[in-house]
Regions:
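Active-site-proximal, glycine-rich beta->alpha crossover segments in alpha/beta enzymes
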Residues: 2-11, 88-192
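Structured alpha-helical segments in the cores of large, soluble enzyme domains
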Residues: 25-27, 189-194
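N-terminal basic, low-complexity leaders that serve as flexible interaction/assembly modules and, when applicable
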Residues: 1-96
C-alpha cells in the first residue's frame, strides 16, 4: 500500500493507493492518473540458487523501489538447468549469468529428441513455488508478472545462451529438428503455466 501526498485540480490530500487498483483504474480510464506506476526488475545472482533468498530479494527490492507491479525476474537459466545443463551459478553480484559446463542442446539431434518436461521436474517446481509465494504475498494488492520465455528463446538458452548464431544456423540447416524442440518446449511451458 502506497501513501502519496498530492494536490491536483480535482482533489488534494493524502490517499492510499494500492498498486493493483491504481493500474486497473488507469487501464479502464485510459489515463495515467496522478501518479506514475512504478516497476522494475533485477537479477539476483547470489540469491538465484536458493528459493528463500530469491523470494526475500524480490520482496525487499519491490518494497524499497515502491513498486506498483511486481516483476519476477526468475533465475535466468532455470530452464537449461531443468533440462540437465551443468551450470555453475554466478558468485558475482554484478554478473547475473554463471558458467555453463555443458548445454542440453549441442546438435540438431539433441534438439529433435528434446523431451517435454512436466511440473514435477524439481527445478521447475522450485520456480513455481517461489512465484506462488510472491503472488500470495501481494494477492489483491499488486499485480505480479513472472518471466517466461517463448520456446524459440529457450532453444537458444539451452544451446548457446547469449549467442543466437547457433539457433539461426539450426533454423537454416535442420528446421524439422528445431520444430520438434519448439513443440517440446511449448508443452513444457504449458505444464509450467498450469
Amino acid at each position: 500500500i502506497i501513501r502519496r501526498e498530492f494536490t491536483t485540480e480535482r482533489m488534494e490530500g493524502t490517499v492510499v493507493i494500492e498498486g493493483y487498483n491504481e493500474i486497473k483504474r488507469m487501464v479502464e480510464e485510459k489515463t495515467l492518473g496522478d501518479k506514475l506506476t512504478i516497476t522494475g526488475w533485477y537479477h539476483f545472482p547470489l540469491a538465484d540458487p536458493v528459493a528463500d533468498d530469491f523470494y526475500n530479494e524480490t520482496i525487499d527490492t519491490a518494497k524499497q523501489g515502491d513498486w506498483d507491479l511486481i516483476k519476477i525476474m526468475t533465475c535466468g537459466n532455470y530452464m537449461p538447468v531443468a533440462y540437465g545443463a551443468d551450470y555453475e551459478f554466478s558468485t558475482n553480484p554484478e554478473k547475473w549469468d554463471g558458467v555453463f559446463h555443458s548445454h542440453p542442446i549441442t546438435c540438431a539431434e539433441d534438439a529433435a529428441n528434446l523431451p517435454a518436461l512436466d511440473a514435477t521436474n524439481p527445478t521447475l517446481a522450485a520456480e513455481v513455488e517461489v512465484d506462488r509465494r510472491i503472488v500470495e504475498t501481494y494477492k489483491g494488492k499488486k499485480p505480479v508478472l513472472a518471466t517466461l520465455f517463448d520456446p524459440l528463446s529457450w532453444v537458444q538458452e539451452l544451446s548457446t545462451p547469449m549467442e543466437p548464431e547457433w539457433t539461426l544456423n539450426l533454423m537454416r540447416t535442420d528446421p524439422e529438428a528445431l520444430l520438434k524442440a519448439l513443440d517440446a518446449l511449448e508443452k513444457t511451458n504449458d505444464a509450467f503455466l498450469d
